[in-house]
Structures are given as C-alpha cells and as structure tokens.
Amino acid sequence: MSKTSADIIIIGGGAAGLMAAAGAARTLSAKKPEAKVIVLEKMPRPGRKIMITGKGRCNFTNLKNWNEFSEHVHPKPGFLKPSFYNLTSEKMIDYLTDAGMESVVERGDRAFPASHLASDVVDALVGSAEYAGAEVLCGKEVNKISHAEDAEERYTVACNDGSIYTSRKLIICTGGLSYPKTGSTGDGYRWAKEMGHSIKALFPSLTAIVPSGYKDVTPLSKEKSVVKGHIDRSTPLAETGSMLCGNQLKNVGLSIVIDGNIADEEFGDLDFTDGGLEGPIGFKMSRKCVNALINGSKVVAVIDMKPAVEIEDLQVRIATLWNEIAKDKRSANKLYKDRFRILLTKVLPMQLIPAFVKLNPNADHKTLAKTLKAWKMEIEGFVGYERCVVTAGGVNIEEITPKTLESRLIPGLYFAGEVIDLDGDTGGYNLQIAFSTGYLAGMSAARQLIY
C-alpha cells in the first residue's frame, strides 16, 4: 500500500480540475517551488467530457462581457463574479494561446479551437498544468476521503488501487452526473455530504425535452430513473417522433408555458432529434422544463414558425396565397386537402409538412396563420443524465465562500466546476464556469499555504 504526501490534492481531471492544478502550481512556484500539487483522475485520460463538448469541436468559452455573460448563469450568477473577473473569457483565450492553441470566435461570441478539435483544448490544459509543476495521475478512482482538523495533513484520500494520498488542502472538481461514461458519476456530491455540506436538488439541464407521443414509451417511475419524467433516449421513436426527427427549424420563436403561464420565450434555431426538441433554444429552455416536470407541473412548448410576421399580416398573406391557388387551373379542381397541402408548401419546409398535418388535424386555410404562430406541443418528459450536457443543482453555494471557493464549514476544502450549484446555458458558458472557478480555487488554496 503506497502513501504519498502532497500540499494540494485535486480530485477530478476535467476542466475545473486541470485549471485548479495550474492555478495552484503557478501560485506556489514563486514562493514555495517545492510544494506538491497532485490531480487524481479516475479515467485512463484526463478531460474525457471536454472531448465530446460541441460534438467534438469544443465551444470552450463565450466572449460576452460580465453583464451579458451573467444572464446565462443559474441560479445565482453573482456567486461566479469573483471567479469570472479573476479569469475572464478573454484571459482564458490568452491562457490557451500561451499553451500553443489558437482560437476562433463564431456567431454568438462562441470561441472554439482553430482546429475545431476538442483534443487540442485538453492537450493545452494538461500541458499547462504539468508545465506549471502539477502532477496529473490517471486511473486513480477515489473511494474514500477523510479529514482530521488537528493534523497538518488533514486530508487523506484512498484510491481503489490501494494507494493513499494525504494533503493540507483538498479541491473537489468531480463534475456532475451528466455523461457518466466520461467519469461523471456524482462522487463529489456524496463526499461533500459526508463532510457536512448540503446538496441542492440535482436534475438534468441542456437536454432534449420530449413532446407527448414523441417516444414509444411512458415516463419511467422514480424507482427506475434518477428523476421523474426521464425518458430513455434509446427507446424507439413513436410515429410523431419519426415524422419530426431530422427537421431543423431556423429563426423560430419558442415559448414555454408552465401551468398556463408563459415562463420563458426565445428566438433562434430548434432541432427535432431522436431525443426530442434540442438545438440552441430547445436546450436553453430545458432547464425550466425539466424542473417544472419534476415538480408535477404541466408544460407546453409553443413554436412560432413566423416570428418576424404579425399574425394579421400573416393572415393576409395566406389568404392571398389561397386565392392564387384557387385561381390556378392546375389546382382548381383538386380536393380541398390537396389544395391545402399546396398552401403548406409555400409557408413550411417540405419535410415538415407530414408531421404538421398529423399534429394539427383541424388546421385549414382560415386557421393556418394562428396555428403557425402558436404550434403547441405538450411536453411529457426529458432525456436524462446519459445525454444531458450539464447537471443543475449541486453543493450549496451558500456554504462556499465566493471569493476563494473554500468551504465555509471545513477549512482547507474547496469546490469548483459542475459539482457546485452553478450551471450555464449552451454557448460556452459551462466550460468557462469550470475554468474560472477551478483556477480561483487552485490559487486560493495555494495562497493559504504561502501566507
């Protein structure tokens, strides 16, 4: 049984953990170069979840200023402010540039590696941490953490391979529950709870929301699922899902109605996938939808297919088109349903028409404008942790000092990244949250060792 002593141990070699390692090692290098910083990562390689971010392209940050950035952070963006100003989005780009990775900025202020390879981000993060002096150890699955307040090395970390590590400071950067195959299995929540911290309710966010009848299943019971309303992504699509799957709607409006009240409205792109409603605005709306479904509320998604046109103008346009179709000799003698389909081809994408007709059986040329402006779909469930982008909820931020990320309950214990009750919208926000909180936690732990 091997035993290794360190000054700072970081559990988790993801975005937050690698930045915590760099922040700690860089801070220690000037005043305490002999100090030892160790990252314990249970997977064979670090940064596994980063590798699948943005479908492998890795939208690693967003260049919006704090006022705009904070609007995309939940539930209390103010908690992030000290971390963000310590390591802003611009500073993060400079950090990666110094590590040899060039970046490009695309629509919506989203930053990507110029190569469009997530592996370049991981290589830069690992390289920077190791260059600063941190040691990144993989295949180290932690099974127990203990702490003794009266000991100099107050934290003892035991791994499944029998190795034991002791340290003066401990930073937990274990991520959430999303994409468990990447190593995010919620271990940090258990350890935090064992050490006296409370955990805010966990639920999937940035995930597909599933309209009624979309999947050939009913929602699973609590006993069979991590959350009520979860729908297995692998279940076959029902007829509705099969007809809608693959359609990508550009520049549409989406409103979410919860128990009869409009909870949120967005404009942008919406995708129908094998999971349900996704795409930028689908993902952004999912946080409120999932939370509402878990609490037993009725959720309805309302799609505005023509958000740039007022309903009165759309009615006039459709009436004009209908009259033109009626006067056309080629369609004048056709059945009503055939003429109506001709009308639909002029206002909807061709591939969407079969599903639209199926889901709106009572629509006709007189009511079409109203239906296009408010295509309603009741939401019955959501795709769970196996495919959601981020976990909402986590270690209670009221029990963490925002200026240092140190526990208010246990000295020398720090938290960073997805494990804490802080999450963002799609668009590079979540990785920046991880980078900023990780770096500040590492710096703070190191400063306590120096001063």
Which residues make up each language-model segment?
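Conserved N-terminal glycine-rich FAD pyrophosphate-binding loop of Rossmann-like flavoproteins
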Residues: 42-74
